[in-house]
Amino acid sequence: MDLSPYIKISERDNFTIYSYPKKYLELFLDELFYQKSIEINDDHTFKMSKNGYIIDNFNKESSVDFEYLRQSQIAVYWIHEWYDYLIKNSDNKNITFKTKLIELSNEDIESLFNFKTYGIIPESLLKIIDDSITEINNLCFVRTDAYSPKDLVFENKIDNLKVSDALTAIKLITDSERCCQKLFSNDQIISKYLAIREYVNLDTNYEFRCFIYNWNLRAICQSGFEYNSELHAKKKIIRDSILKFWNKFESICPYSECTMDIIYDNNFKNTLNDSCIMVIEFNSFGPHMNADSGLYDWDRDYILLTKSNQPHFLLAEKPLNTI
C-alpha cells in the first residue's frame, strides 16, 4: 500500500499488522469495517494478508479486500456521483461549473489506451467528445471524473488545461499519468466517465478547501500554501461570503463528511445566496483516505476539523524571517 496512512506494526509470514487512525476511529470503522461486519481489535490494529485481504479474529483470510473498500469509499466523491444532484437541487443558481459527463464503455477505455499506444482513436468517440465541447461552449477543461490532468501543468508539459477539440482533450487525458492511473490500472475501482467542464479563467489564489464533518462546516483554508497579502486584505469579505454560501448550501450538501473545494470571485453572478462562491469538487475526509488537509494537519487539528462549532478560517502567514 504505497503512501499508506496506516502504520505498519509488524510483519509475519502470512500477514502484516497495521494500526489505524485512532483520532478518526469512528469514521474509519464506519467506512471500512462496520459495513462489512468485520470485528475490530481492541488495540486499534487490523491484520492484512499478503494478498491484501483482512484477516479475521480466527486468523483466517476473509473475503474483504481492504484496499478495494478504501478505494470504493474514495470513489463516492467522483464527479458523476454528485454533479446531477447539485444541479437538480440548486434552484437554478450557478452552483458549480457546467459539465457534460460522458460514460465510457469498456470498448471506449480500450480505444483510449490504444490512442496512448498507437495514436489512433475511433471517429465515433471523437464525435461524442466534440459534441460535448460544443454543447459546453467550445472552450473546456477536460478530466476523468476521478482526476484532472493537472500533473501535466506541474511538470511544465503544458501551460494550461483548456481545450477546444476532442483530439486535444484525448491527448491531455492519455498523456496524464494521474488520469491514466484510474483509467487503465488493474484497480478494481476505475474511472468510467470523462467530464467535459466549462473552462473559466479564474484566479486560483481564491480557491479554498472546506472541511465538513457530521454535516457541519468545521474549517476553511486557502488552497495555496504561500502568503498572499490580497487574501489577508479581503479576509473578512471572503469568510463572510463562504458562510453566506454555506447558510444555503448546508441543506443540500451531498456528504456528511468531505473536503469541498470552492472558489470565490466577486464577478460570479446568480450564485447561491448571492455569495460569489462556486463549487469545484468534493473529496474524501480524514487521514485514512486520499485528500490532503491543506494548511491544517489531520492529526494536530483533529478537534478543530471535527468539533469546531464556528468554522475556523485559515490563511497562510508570512514566514517569520520576512516579517
From Swiss-Prot:
Which domain of life does this protein belong to?
A: Viruses
InterPro entries, A to Z: CDC123
Instruction: Give the residue spans that cross the bilayer.
Output: none
Family, as annotated:
Belongs to the CDC123 family.
**PANTHER family (alphabetical):** CELL DIVISION CYCLE PROTEIN 123 HOMOLOG, D123 PROTEIN
Q: Return the protein name.
A: Putative CDC123-like protein L884
Write down the species.
Acanthamoeba polyphaga mimivirus
Upper classification of the organism: Viruses, Varidnaviria, Bamfordvirae, Nucleocytoviricota, Megaviricetes
